[in-house]
Design a protein with these regions (language model features):
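Non-catalytic, solvent-exposed segments at the cell envelope interface
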Residues: 1-261
Length: 261
């Protein structure tokens, strides 16, 4: 039996260069208790795909959104109701549509990758980011000299979570949501692949607006790194699933989760 008014949405940011899903966040929207909780799934998490051990971001590469959602659902023991995949151009367009975002860049960023034609140069501190700037900030892993977050992908996920919260705040501000709904719809049609209708999205936006941006929170699935994979912690992951993500009335058990060791 499912809880009423509770939905799970897998949000994926696609890497245009390698065809994989670079960012995966499972979002629970609880319209009854009034909260939104997003959990980042490290892209190097170990998963079994086609009977072989792989990194989870390979699932999109192999079978698109459907296989990615099935893999996440199998691992966490809960259904993925909806999927939203956005490519890099869509991310940039959305940030520009809301007039850019003021964001506290967490560290000095100094990175160049001539192969990807990517240069990332920002000073630590609050600054106004355009769509192109924002994309550079959320893609950053480490500096040219190897310094940076200390834990590349985990540090990057924390920055992405903070940035998404800043975007939600700006998108849901009364001025933006009312005057820019047509802009949002165009961006969704052009750059976003989803099984949500525009009506679904508008309804969800209204529900989140009622909750307020302070009811949006994020964390990362509890994990440990052991080359070449990130391993999800079964006990802590189960607790997190039951606390925030589980759409069922009954708690999930250890048997419901399938986390490769």
């Amino acid at each position: 039996e499912r809880k009423g008014g509770f939905y799970t949405i897998l949000l994926s940011g696609l890497d245009d260069d390698n065809g994989g899903s670079d960012t995966n966040i499972l979002v629970a929207v609880d319209t009854v208790n009034g909260y939104v909780y997003g959990v980042s799934i490290p892209r190097d998490s170990k998963a079994i795909i086609d009977g072989k051990a792989r990194k989870i971001n390979y699932a999109y590469n192999k079978g698109g959104t459907e296989l990615l959602a099935d893999t996440v659902s199998e691992q966490l023991g809960i259904p993925v109701d909806y999927t939203v995949s956005v490519n890099l151009k869509g991310f940039t367009a959305l940030v520009d549509a809301i007039g850019g975002v003021d964001f506290d860049v967490p560290i000095n960023m100094d990175y160049d990758d001539p192969i990807q034609n990517l240069s990332i140069h920002f000073k630590k501190g609050v600054q106004h980011l355009s769509g192109a700037d924002a994309l550079r900030v959320v893609r950053f892993r480490h500096n040219n000299d190897g310094s940076g977050y200390g834990s590349e992908d985990l540090g990057r996920m924390a920055t992405q979570q903070k940035f998404l919260k800043a975007v939600a705040k700006k998108m849901l501000s009364a001025g933006n949501i009312l005057t820019k709904i047509d802009d949002y719809a165009k961006i969704f049609n052009q750059y976003v692949d989803t099984n949500l209708t525009v009506g679904n999205l508008a309804w969800l936006g209204t529900e989140v607006l009622k909750m307020g941006v302070d009811k949006i929170d994020f964390s990362t699935l509890p994990n440990a790194w052991k080359y070449p994979y990130i391993y999800l912690d079964p006990t802590e992951t189960l607790t997190l699933v039951n606390t925030y993500l589980n759409p069922y009335v009954e708690d999930r058990t250890a048997e419901d989760l399938h986390l490769p060791s």
